[in-house]
């Protein structure tokens, strides 16, 4: 089997994003469009045949970086990996962006400023551009955003109530101090000493990827879905 964009396929499958599953089937059959072209076309609501090489590159970063509930930070990481100049990108496409999503992104930026949160070194224009791309991708993927919410809710309730919870094909349950996620294959992902806090959210204990120390690690729906799709 062709394993191109395997994680994107798994996200679509767990989310039951039907239009995307159909697109993967058509592509594999040799009758469908390139998925990065299609990602851009769906987000910007333009004919897929009109997507240029540069626009495909935008679609590729959107597709690879936003599936796990990533936002501006994830897009910045992806852009760096593919040699994108986000300030130039903003200059090139800002005026073409849909005004509704631009206004939403502007309001989000004002909230970020008020909270003194991370802006990733971007100018206002570049931040709004990237956040708008995020919003366009999410609106084109309603089932995917739905599975993020379902996973978050199921994980939280499993910890709080200690009763099994389901999110699509996934089952969350507590076994002692461990949060277990039953995958569609029947295998389990396990998160030791899992707990939920109203302010911190979901956390568990594991080896931190940066410090290599055993410590408390915070997680959320997107990271849980990433673990699931990479298992």
Where are these regions (language model features)?
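Conserved catalytic core of nucleotide polymerization and phosphodiester-bond processing enzymes
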Residues: 1-231
């Amino acid at each position: 089997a062709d394993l191109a964009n395997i994680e994107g396929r798994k996200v679509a499958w767990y989310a039951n994003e039907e239009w995307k599953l159909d697109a993967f089937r058509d592509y594999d059959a040799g009758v469908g469009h390139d998925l990065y072209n299609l990602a851009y076309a769906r987000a910007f609501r333009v004919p897929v045949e009109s997507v240029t090489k540069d626009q495909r590159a935008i679609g590729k970063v959107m597709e690879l970086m936003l599936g796990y509930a990533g936002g501006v930070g994830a897009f910045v990481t992806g852009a760096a990996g593919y040699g994108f100049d986000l300030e130039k990108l903003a200059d090139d496409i800002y005026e073409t962006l849909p005004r509704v999503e631009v206004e939403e992104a502007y309001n989000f930026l004002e909230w970020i400023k008020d909270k003194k949160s991370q802006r990733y070194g971007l100018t206002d224009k570049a931040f709004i551009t990237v956040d708008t791309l995020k919003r366009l991708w999410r609106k084109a993927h309603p089932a995917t955003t739905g599975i993020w919410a379902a996973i978050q809710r199921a994980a939280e309730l499993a910890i709080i109530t200690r009763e099994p919870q389901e999110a699509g094909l996934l089952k969350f349950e507590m076994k002692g101090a461990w949060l277990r996620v039953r995958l569609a294959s029947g295998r389990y992902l396990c998160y030791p000493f899992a707990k939920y806090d109203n302010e911190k959210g979901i956390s568990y204990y594991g080896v931190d990827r940066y410090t290599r120390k055993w410590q408390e690690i915070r997680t959320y729906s997107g990271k849980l879905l990433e673990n699931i799709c990479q298992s």
